[in-house]
Amino acid sequence: MLYQLSKATTRIRLKRQKAVPQHRWLWSLAFLAAFTLKDVRCADLAISIPNNPGLDDGASYRLDYSPPFGYPEPNTTIASREIGDEIQFSRALPGTKYNFWLYYTNFTHHDWLTWTVTITTAPDPPSNLSVQVRSGKNAIILWSPPTQGSYTAFKIKVLGLSEASSSYNRTFQVNDNTFQHSVKELTPGATYQVQAYTIYDGKESVAYTSRNFTTKPNTPGKFIVWFRNETTLLVLWQPPYPAGIYTHYKVSIEPPDANDSVLYVEKEGEPPGPAQAAFKGLVPGRAYNISVQTMSEDEISLPTTAQYRTVPLRPLNVTFDRDFITSNSFRVLWEAPKGISEFDKYQVSVATTRRQSTVPRSNEPVAFFDFRDIAEPGKTFNVIVKTVSGKVTSWPATGDVTLRPLPVRNLRSINDDKTNTMIITWEADPASTQDEYRIVYHELETFNGDTSTLTTDRTRFTLESLLPGRNYSLSVQAVSKKMESNETSIFVVTRPSSPIIEDLKSIRMGLNISWKSDVNSKQEQYEVLYSRNGTSDLRTQKTKESRLVIKNLQPGAGYELKVFAVSHDLRSEPHAYFQAVYPNPPRNMTIETVRSNSVLVHWSPPESGEFTEYSIRYRTDSEQQWVRLPSVRSTEADITDMTKGEKYTIQVNTVSFGVESPVPQEVNTTVPPNPVSNIIQLVDSRNITLEWPKPEGRVESYILKWWPSDNPGRVQTKNVSENKSADDLSTVRVLIGELMPGVQYKFDIQTTSYGILSGITSLYPRTMPLIQSDVVVANGEKEDERDTITLSYTPTPQSSSKFDIYRFSLGDAEIRDKEKLANDTDRKVTFTGLVPGRLYNITVWTVSGGVASLPIQRQDRLYPEPITQLHATNITDTEISLRWDLPKGEYNDFDIAYLTADNLLAQNMTTRNEITISDLRPHRNYTFTVVVRSGTESSVLRSSSPLSASFTTNEAVPGRVERFHPTDVQPSEINFEWSLPSSEANGVIRQFSIAYTNINNLTDAGMQDFESEEAFGVIKNLKPGETYVFKIQAKTAIGFGPEREYRQTMPILAPPRPATQVVPTEVYRSSSTIQIRFRKNYFSDQNGQVRMYTIIVAEDDAKNASGLEMPSWLDVQSYSVWLPYQAIDPYYPFENRSVEDFTIGTENCDNHKIGYCNGPLKSGTTYRVKVRAFTGADKFTDTAYSFPIQTDQDNTSLIVAITVPLTIILVLLVTLLFYKRRRNNCRKTTKDSRANDNMSLPDSVIEQNRPILIKNFAEHYRLMSADSDFRFSEEFEELKHVGRDQPCTFADLPCNRPKNRFTNILPYDHSRFKLQPVDDDEGSDYINANYVPGHNSPREFIVTQGPLHSTRDDFWRMCWESNSRAIVMLTRCFEKGREKCDQYWPNDTVPVFYGDIKVQILNDSHYADWVMTEFMLCRGSEQRILRHFHFTTWPDFGVPNPPQTLVRFVRAFRDRIGAEQRPIVVHCSAGVGRSGTFITLDRILQQINTSDYVDIFGIVYAMRKERVWMVQTEQQYICIHQCLLAVLEGKENIVGPAREMHDNEGYEGQQVQLDENGDVVATIEGHLSHHDLQQAEAEAIDDENAAILHDDQQPLTSSFTGHHTHMPPTTSMSSFGGGGGGHTNVDAPDRXHSVVNQSDNNNSVVIVLVDNKPSSMICKDSKGGNIDVLESQQQQQQQQQQQPNQGGHNITTISAINGYNTLQHRRKSQLITFSSSSCDIKNSLSHEYINGSNGSAANGPPSSGSGSGSGPGSNRASRANVRLSFAEEDVMILPQNHSQQSNHQDDEVFTRRRSLLEVEIGVEVGEDGELAPHEMEEDLEEEDEDEELYMHDEFETHIDTKSNNANDDSGGGSYEDSHALHSSLGGSNRNSLEKDDDDIEVDVISTDVSCYDQLLGSSCNTRNGDDDDIATLVGDGDYSTTKLSKASRLSGAGVGGLVVSGGGGGTAIGGGIAVNGGGVLGNGVGSEAGGGIIYANPFMDDEGIAESGM
C-alpha cells in the first residue's frame, strides 16, 4: 500500500475591532495540513500577526481551542515579544472539528477576544486497499476505513496506466459500509491504479491510498516455424485477437535442448504485428514441441502449441575419383556429416537430370556411388548429395564433375612463307563437348628441351613462335572444364632464316664477302651464287663459314651475288647484292690555263679494263676535305670559283659502278689575291685609323704608303701582317699616328699571298683641328633676364692647330648656330628671344676644311615666370584645396609650403596648378606660399619669386579623451573624472557621453550625458560583481569623437540585512530533525548576487553567532546547552526554485572528523534557526533567529519494531523482482539499472590502467563475455563519469552554443582545438573539437562532431591550421531520415570555396564499405593534398557486423597514412562513439606489434579525459575486444566455413559462408561474370547482414543515373533464381519510382522499391524482362497487360486488397522480393493479398468459389503438406522513406536485433533498435540493447498444412482450418502438427517471401514465363509437357496454373488457391487405373522430397 501525500492551504483574514484605536492590525490565519508516512494524524496551523507590537513588554496572547488535542496546549499564553509575526499550532487530530479563540492582554486590556473560528480537519485515507482480478475485463476493489478519525463516504478513482488505457479515468463515490466496489469494461492485459480517498464533512483526505493491478492478457494466435536450420528454429506467431494489452511473449520448447529453452520476447508495433523468437543449439533432425503465451506484468495467458523438426546435417567433402572418369561414367565420393545428426540415408542426384538415387547409411567414413551410361562426353554435371531424415533433407553438398571429351580429328599443318608462320587445323568430334583445345609441341633434336603448351577455343591456330630450321612434334587435345581428351599428333619442319650480308668489299681483280645468320635459326651450310653484269655466266660456291673471297675477276666489271642458308634440304629466302671490281687509273695529267679564279686541267685514259666515267676533286693545302666536281667522260675539265690567293691540289680518277681506282692522278697550282676595299677612316687631331674588311681569299700581309697632300716628298711606309692586323678576324685595323691637326694626307694600300701582289687602293683623309678656348655665360645669374644668353670666349693659337672659323650652338633647332672667323677680335656672342625657364645646351667648335674639332659644352637655364593668383576651391576640417594660374614659359613643378600646428615647415610638390592639403588640424588658420620651379636638384634648378595666401579649416569631431578613470567605486555605482586637451577639441565642445556595457550580459547597457564644462560624473544602477566596459566620448557640433575605454569589475559587499520578521519557518519536526523553509527573496542582490547559503542553529541564541568561522556540530557536543553552530557547508539551493526546505539533523557524524556535519538534534529541545547568505567567501549577512522550535520526544524503539520487518520484506521483494527481470531480459543491457548516477565510482578510485597480456587475451575475453557480457557491463559502467567534472566554459558561451550539434556533447576547455581568431570576433576561435591521444603522439587525433552547415567553413579552417593531411569520417550524412553530418565537400570535381579555402576533388576510390577521396586544398598560393576516408556502413550507436570489416578499414587507413602524418581529423555524428571506437582500434592494432600486452580500458579512460563519452556504448566497447580477438586468432580475413544455399537450378554451384553459430558472413558464389558484377548495384543494405565477401583493395564503381554504388570486383552476389544477381540499393533521393537495371545472363532479377504512386507500374530489366513491384490494388487492376519480356526475367507483383495486415497497416517499411524465372513452384505464382473473409480469388469473380483447381479431374480429396524455404539474401526490406535518403544501409535487413523480418500481411519489421540522437540529451545515452540478435544465416519456413478438398464441379475444394497461419487469422484453434507418413508432401522451393505470403492467405497467379520455362508433370501412364504461357492469368476460383493431361486420363494440377481456407497450392490430385502421383514440383524426387534444403 502506498500513501500519496498532498498539501492544502487555507488562509483566513480578519480585521481587529476598534478597542485600541492606536493599533489597527490585519491578521491572517494560515492552516497548513501536512501528512507524512510517520504521522498522518497531525495538522499544522500558523496564526499570522503582521503588525505585532513586539516591543511592548507587557503585551501577551492566549490561545484556547477544543477538543484539547494539539500543540501548544489549550490556554497557552505567549509574550508578544516572543511571538514575532506568527503563532505555530500543530498536532491536530484528523477528521475532527476544532473551535479556536485568541485573546489579547496588555496594560489597558485583559483577555480581549480578538478572533474565533471553527475548522474541520481533513480525514485520513482508507486502509488495507486490495484488488481481486476476476478476468481480463472485471476486477473487485476492497478497503478498510481509516484507523483514526471520522468519515462519511469514500471516493474511488481508477486510472489507466498503460498507454492504450491511459484514457480510462473513472471515479466512484461509495456511501455505504460495504467497503468494496466492482469495476467492469477493463482492457485485457492493461495496468490500472486505484486511488482511495476518505470524505468527512465534505472534506477529502489530503492523502490517498493506492494500488496497481493488471488484468489477464488474451491468448496469442497460431504460429509457424518459418526459418530453421540444423540447430535453429525461428518461431513466428500472430498476436492475440483482439490484441488487448500485453508487454511480451513467453516462448518455450521441449525437449529443452536449446541454449535458452524459455525466451521472453517484447511486443513491438502498435497495433502489434506478428512476433518471432529463435531457439538455437538444438539437435539436428529432432522433433520439438513449442508453446507461445502472452504476458502483461505478472499475468500470463493460456498457451498456443505446435511441433516441428530441425534439419539434419549435410554430407561433407564431395569429391570425384579421377581414375574412374571416362567419356560416359564417373564415381562420386563423400564423407558422413560430423557431429550428432539423425538421418537414414543419402540422396544422390545430377542437377540437370531427374534421376535420383539413394545410398543407405553405413558406418564407413566415406561413401560412394557410380554413375554410368552417360552419353555426353565432355559435359559438366553438378552432383548433389544430401542426408535424409524421414522426409526432411539436409542442405545439399555439391560438386562439379566433367566427363572426358573425345579426341580431335584431321590434324594438319600449313607453312606460310610470307608471314613466316605455321597454321594448324583440326576437326572436333561432333559427339563430344569441349570448351577449348590444348596444343603441345617440342623440338625433336633437342634433348630435355622445353615443351610449349597453348590453348584456344577454335579449330584453327597460327603458331608464330616456332624457331626457323627446326623439326617439331605437335599434338592437339580437346579440353572440357580442364578435363583433357587423348592426344592427336603430327611432325612439322620450319624453313631456316635468310642470312644477311654484313660486308662486301672490292679488291684487285676480286671481291671479299661476309654475312651473319639469325641466332635462333639452324642451318647445315651456305650457298653463294654470282654472275658478271651483262653475261649469263652463273657460278656457285658452297661453304660452312660465314665469309668467302672470290678472285680472278675483270677490273672495273660489276657482279650480282646471292647467299642462301640450307637446313633439312630447305633453302631459306636469298639475300642478293651487286658489287663492282676496282678499275685501272688515268694517265698524263697537266695544267693547261690559270685565270683569276679558275684552272683548265687535261689527262689521258687508262691502258685497259672497264670504267664508266672520271671523277674530279680538289682542295687547298690547309684543308682535308676534297671538293668533288660532277663526273665527266671527256679527258679535260675547267675548275672555277676558286679562292683567290690559295694554293690548290687537283685529282682525277676512273670510276666503275661507283667504285673508284685506288691510285688517282694529281697536280698543284696558286690563284692571285684580292685588293682591299670599303676602307673606313677614324680621324682625330693627331691620328688616323684605317679599317677595312678582310678581302675574300688568302692574304698574308698588307703594304701601306702615305704623305701630306701639299708635300709629296714626305713618303712613309708600313707593312702589316695578316695575323697582327686586328683582333677581329673579319676586319683589318691600322693606326697611323704623329700627324698634324687640321692637315690633309694621301694613302696607297696593297695585299700579298705566296709572294704575289694585288692591285693598289688610294684615299685622302684630313685630321681634326683643335679648340683651346675658354667659354663662359655672361648673364647666367641675373633673374630679370629671362629670355637672353650672352657667351664670352678666348682665342685658340694658330700654332697648335690649323682651322678656319669658330662655331656656336644652343642645341635648339629653332635657334640658328652662329660662326666667327678665326682672326675676329670680338670675343662675345649673344642669343635673344629665348624661352623663360628652359635649359639650353651650349656647344663651341673650331672648323678646318669642313672638319670640326671636338666641342666645348656648357649648360644654362633661364629663370621661370612666377604665378599671379592663389585661391582656395574647397575647405573641410582636415583638408584645403588650392588653385592658381599657370605661368608662361617652361617649368617642372610647383612648391607649396606652410607651417603645421606644431610650427614645422611642410612642403608639397605638384606638377598641376592645384593641390589638396590633407592631415590638417580642424578649426586652424594656415598660410600657404607657392613657388614655380624649373629643373631638378640633380640638374640646373631655377625658382621664381613666391606668392602667399591664408585660409582656416572647418570644425570636426573632437579627439579622444586623454584621462578617464574612476575616483570612487561602489557595488552599484561608480564616479569618474576625465579631461580633454584643448589641442584635441577640434571645435567647440558641446557635451561628454559615457556608455557602459556588461560584458557578460550585453542587454545590461546604458548611456549618460554630461555638460561640456563638467570633468566629473557618476553612473548608477550597476550590478555588483559584474564587469563593465565604460566608454567616454566628447561631442562638437559635428558629432562624437573616438572612444576612451575603461574596464571595471563592480565590488561585492555583504548582502543588506533583511527585516527582523524575515526568518526561516518551521515545516516539520521529529525527535532529532527540524525541517525549515526559507525563500530566495529573503536577501537582496543589491550588494552582489547571493551565491551560497548556510544554516546557523542555536540552542542558546544569546551567544555571539556573527563570526565567519562558526563552530560545527562536533564542536558543540561537549556543551550541555549547545552554542550557535553551523549545520552544513555553504551551498546554493535555488537553481530551479525560489523556496528551500532544509532538514536539520539528517546526517550521522560518527565518522566525520573535520568540516561541518548536519548531525542529529536533541529530542524535546527548543532551538532557534537563522539563515546566512554569502555574496563572497568572507561577505555574509544573517537573518534574525526564527521562533523557538521544539523537537519531538524520541520514539525510536517503536519505530524500529515496525521498520525492521518491513525492510526485510522490501528487500526480499526487490531481490525477487530483480531475479525475475534478469531472467526475462537475459540479453538486456544494464541501462535502467544504471539510472542513478550516484552509484558510479569517482575517477580517483578507478584503476586507470588494466593491461592484459596478449597471450591471455582470448581467455580474458571469454571471462568478460560470460553471463551475457556481465563483466563488460560492470567495467564499462566504471567509465561513465570519467572526465565529466572538467569545465566546458567556452562551448557554453552564447556565441558558441549554435555551433554545437548536440547540447551535451561539448569539448573540454583544456584539450579543445583553438582556431586562429578572426578580427577579434568573440567565439571565432571555437570549434567543437578536442585533441585525443593516439599510439604515436598525445595529440595524434583531432576528434570533432559532424560539421553543421554553419560550421563547415570552421571545419576546413581547422584542417588547414592544424596542417592535417587525413580525415576519417565514420557516419553517413543522413541516417534514418535525420541529418548526421553536413556534406562539407564538393559534389563533383568542380572546386568549391569554404571561406577562403578552396577544396577540389582529385580522385576517389569506392570500396564495399568505404570510400577514399583525395582533395586538393588551396589557400592563397599554398596547396595541400588531403585524403578523406569515409566508412559508409557503420550504424549510429551500433557496430559493424562482422567486426572484421572495421579491422580492414583501419588497416587500409594505416597503410596509406603514416605515423608522422598527424594530426588526423576523426568525426562521426557527435564525435564520441564511433570516433572513439576507431581510435581505440587503431591504437591497439599498433600496440600489439610493439608490446606483449594491451590496455583497452586504459585507452578509453585516457580518451575520456580529453573528450566526453569517447566509446559511447557498451556495444562499441565489446566490439573493440571482438576486433582484437579476431586479429589475434588470425580470423581477420577469414569468415567461417562455407555452406550452400538451396539446391535449385537457380542456385547451381552457389555457396554461402557461415560462422560457427550459423550466421551468414560471406557471399553466395554463383555463375556470375565480372561483366555482370559491373552492371549490378551491389551495395548491401546493412553491413550487419550483407552477404558480401569483398576484396578491400580492389574497388569497383558502377554508375546508376548519375549516382554511384559500390561493389568489389571479386564478389559473386546471391543469385535469386539465376546464376548471378545481387542486392541493389536505390541510391538517390528522387528515385522512389526508379528501377535499378541489373543484368544477368542466368536469369537473375532486378530489385525494385516503389511507393503507391501511379507512376510505379511495370518496369523493364536490362534485358527487357518484366519487373513487377509493390503496388496498391488499384495499380494492380490498371496493369493487367504486362509489357513483353525479351530477356526471360519473371519477377513478382505484390499488391494489397485491404486485408488483415495490408499496406494500409504498415508503418515502417515495405517489402521487396527476389525471384527466379524458372525451376520452382513459386515461379508460377504471384502474390496478391486477399481479404481473409472473402471467398473469391484475387483476380477471379466472387462467385468462382473458394480456391479450387482450374483443371478437370481433381475431384478426389487430397492433403498437401507444404514447406517453404528461402535464404536471407533473397529478401530485402527497405524503409518507406528510403526514397528520400540514399544509402541507409543500417536501417533495415533481417538480422537487426529487435526486428528480423517483416512479411506484408503479418510480420512488420520494426526499427533496428538504434537510437538516433538529434538535439536531445537523452538520445545520446547508451544504446538500449534489449534487441536480441536472433539469426544471421538463412531463413526458411516449414509449414505443415493439411487440406481436405470437398467434391465439387470446379475440381477443387475448401481448405481445412488446420492450416497454422490461417487459424491465426481467424480459423480454428487446431494446431498444425507434423504430417503423417502417408501424406503426399509437396516441397515448394522458394527464394523469396512470396510463398510465405501464400500461406498467409494470398492467392497465386501463374508467373509470366518465356518459352524456355518448361515444367514437366510425370504420372504412371503417359505424360505431357505444357509450357508456361505469358500473362496466363485465369479467372476462376484460383489462378490459372499448369493445365496438363495426366497419365491415362485426367490428372491435373490447378493453379488455384483456397481463398477462404487460406490454402497454399490447389493441387488437384487424381488418378485413374494405374495413375499415380503428379509432382507439382519439378525438383521433387520419387519419394515426394523436394530439394529445398529442408
Curated annotation (Swiss-Prot):
UniProt keyword annotation of Transit peptide present: no
Remarks, miscellaneous: This protein is translated by readthrough of a stop codon. Readthrough of the terminator codon TAG occurs between the codons for Arg-1631 and His-1633. There is currently no sequence that provides the identity of residue 1632.
Gene: Ptp10D
Protein name listed in UniProt: Tyrosine-protein phosphatase 10D
Pfam families, per database record: fn3 (PF00041), PTP_tm (PF18861), Y_phosphatase (PF00102)
Biased composition (Acidic residues): 1805-1828
Catalytic site: C1468 (phosphocysteine intermediate)
GO BP term (any one): open tracheal system development
